[in-house]
UniProtKB/Swiss-Prot annotation:
Signal peptide interval: none
Record protein name field: Sulfurtransferase TusD
Primary site of residence: cytoplasm
Enzyme class at the top of the EC tree: transferase
Highest taxon of source: Bacteria
Length: 130
Protein backbone atom coordinates (compact mmCIF):
# COMPACT_ATOMS: atom_id res chain seq x y z
CA UNK A 1 0.00 0.00 0.00
CA UNK A 2 1.35 3.39 -1.01
CA UNK A 3 1.25 6.17 1.60
CA UNK A 4 1.44 9.96 1.38
CA UNK A 5 4.22 11.45 3.53
CA UNK A 6 5.03 14.92 4.79
CA UNK A 7 8.39 15.72 6.38
CA UNK A 8 9.44 18.54 8.68
CA UNK A 9 13.18 19.24 8.83
CA UNK A 10 14.41 21.23 11.84
CA UNK A 11 18.11 20.45 11.51
CA UNK A 12 20.56 22.65 9.59
CA UNK A 13 22.18 21.54 6.36
CA UNK A 14 25.46 21.06 8.23
CA UNK A 15 26.26 20.53 11.91
CA UNK A 16 24.17 17.45 12.69
CA UNK A 17 22.59 14.50 10.88
CA UNK A 18 18.92 15.52 10.88
CA UNK A 19 18.76 17.09 7.40
CA UNK A 20 20.92 14.38 5.87
CA UNK A 21 18.80 11.66 7.49
CA UNK A 22 15.63 13.35 6.24
CA UNK A 23 16.98 13.41 2.68
CA UNK A 24 17.98 9.74 2.84
CA UNK A 25 14.57 8.84 4.26
CA UNK A 26 12.82 10.84 1.52
CA UNK A 27 14.79 9.04 -1.19
CA UNK A 28 14.06 5.65 0.36
CA UNK A 29 10.32 6.20 0.67
CA UNK A 30 10.10 7.40 -2.94
CA UNK A 31 12.06 4.34 -4.11
CA UNK A 32 9.54 2.15 -2.27
CA UNK A 33 6.68 3.72 -4.23
CA UNK A 34 5.35 6.07 -1.58
CA UNK A 35 4.54 9.72 -2.27
CA UNK A 36 6.22 12.72 -0.68
CA UNK A 37 4.06 15.80 -1.10
CA UNK A 38 5.78 18.38 1.10
CA UNK A 39 8.99 18.97 3.01
CA UNK A 40 8.66 21.85 5.48
CA UNK A 41 11.88 23.43 6.75
CA UNK A 42 11.52 24.98 10.20
CA UNK A 43 13.82 26.46 12.86
CA UNK A 44 17.47 25.80 11.87
CA UNK A 45 16.18 23.62 9.04
CA UNK A 46 15.73 26.79 6.98
CA UNK A 47 19.50 26.76 6.34
CA UNK A 48 18.80 23.90 3.89
CA UNK A 49 17.33 26.56 1.57
CA UNK A 50 20.33 28.93 1.55
CA UNK A 51 21.71 28.92 -2.00
CA UNK A 52 24.92 30.59 -0.80
CA UNK A 53 25.87 27.53 1.20
CA UNK A 54 29.20 26.20 -0.12
CA UNK A 55 30.15 22.81 1.33
CA UNK A 56 33.60 21.31 0.87
CA UNK A 57 34.14 19.29 -2.30
CA UNK A 58 34.01 15.98 -0.44
CA UNK A 59 30.69 16.77 1.31
CA UNK A 60 27.15 16.24 0.08
CA UNK A 61 25.59 19.49 -1.12
CA UNK A 62 22.30 19.16 0.75
CA UNK A 63 20.82 22.39 -0.61
CA UNK A 64 21.18 21.22 -4.21
CA UNK A 65 20.22 17.65 -3.29
CA UNK A 66 16.86 18.83 -1.88
CA UNK A 67 16.34 20.92 -5.02
CA UNK A 68 17.04 17.93 -7.29
CA UNK A 69 14.74 15.66 -5.26
CA UNK A 70 11.93 18.21 -5.53
CA UNK A 71 12.36 18.58 -9.28
CA UNK A 72 12.51 14.84 -9.95
CA UNK A 73 9.52 13.92 -7.78
CA UNK A 74 7.38 17.10 -7.74
CA UNK A 75 7.89 17.66 -4.01
CA UNK A 76 6.94 21.04 -2.55
CA UNK A 77 9.77 22.57 -0.48
CA UNK A 78 8.29 25.05 2.00
CA UNK A 79 10.44 27.20 4.26
CA UNK A 80 9.02 28.91 7.35
CA UNK A 81 9.24 32.60 6.45
CA UNK A 82 9.61 33.87 10.02
CA UNK A 83 12.34 31.36 10.89
CA UNK A 84 14.13 32.04 7.60
CA UNK A 85 14.16 35.81 8.00
CA UNK A 86 15.52 35.49 11.56
CA UNK A 87 18.38 33.39 10.16
CA UNK A 88 19.16 35.55 7.14
CA UNK A 89 17.46 33.46 4.46
CA UNK A 90 15.22 35.52 2.18
CA UNK A 91 13.67 35.63 -1.26
CA UNK A 92 13.67 38.62 -3.63
CA UNK A 93 10.30 39.95 -2.43
CA UNK A 94 11.23 39.92 1.26
CA UNK A 95 14.68 41.34 0.51
CA UNK A 96 13.02 44.24 -1.30
CA UNK A 97 10.48 44.83 1.47
CA UNK A 98 13.20 44.73 4.12
CA UNK A 99 15.58 46.83 2.01
CA UNK A 100 18.25 44.14 1.86
CA UNK A 101 20.78 44.05 -0.96
CA UNK A 102 19.96 40.56 -2.23
CA UNK A 103 18.24 37.26 -1.75
CA UNK A 104 19.66 33.82 -1.04
CA UNK A 105 16.69 31.44 -1.20
CA UNK A 106 17.58 28.47 -3.39
CA UNK A 107 15.30 28.17 -6.45
CA UNK A 108 12.69 25.49 -5.88
CA UNK A 109 12.14 26.47 -2.24
CA UNK A 110 9.23 28.70 -1.24
CA UNK A 111 8.82 30.92 1.81
CA UNK A 112 5.52 30.15 3.52
CA UNK A 113 3.82 30.22 6.88
CA UNK A 114 2.87 27.61 9.42
CA UNK A 115 -0.51 27.36 7.70
CA UNK A 116 1.24 25.50 4.87
CA UNK A 117 2.65 23.06 7.40
CA UNK A 118 -0.79 22.44 8.89
CA UNK A 119 -2.36 21.90 5.45
CA UNK A 120 0.38 19.46 4.48
CA UNK A 121 0.10 17.56 7.77
CA UNK A 122 -3.68 17.25 7.45
CA UNK A 123 -3.37 15.98 3.88
CA UNK A 124 -0.87 13.17 4.43
CA UNK A 125 -0.94 9.69 5.92
CA UNK A 126 2.36 10.04 7.79
CA UNK A 127 4.04 13.14 9.22
CA UNK A 128 7.66 12.73 10.28
CA UNK A 129 9.97 15.29 11.90
CA UNK A 130 13.74 15.28 11.59
Amino acid sequence: MSLDYCLMVTGPAYGNQRASSALQFARALLECGHRLGTVFFYQDGVHNANRLSAPAGDEVDLVRAWHELAQQHQVALHVCAAAALRRGVTDALQASLLKRSGENLQPGFELSGLGSLVQAALGCDRFIQF
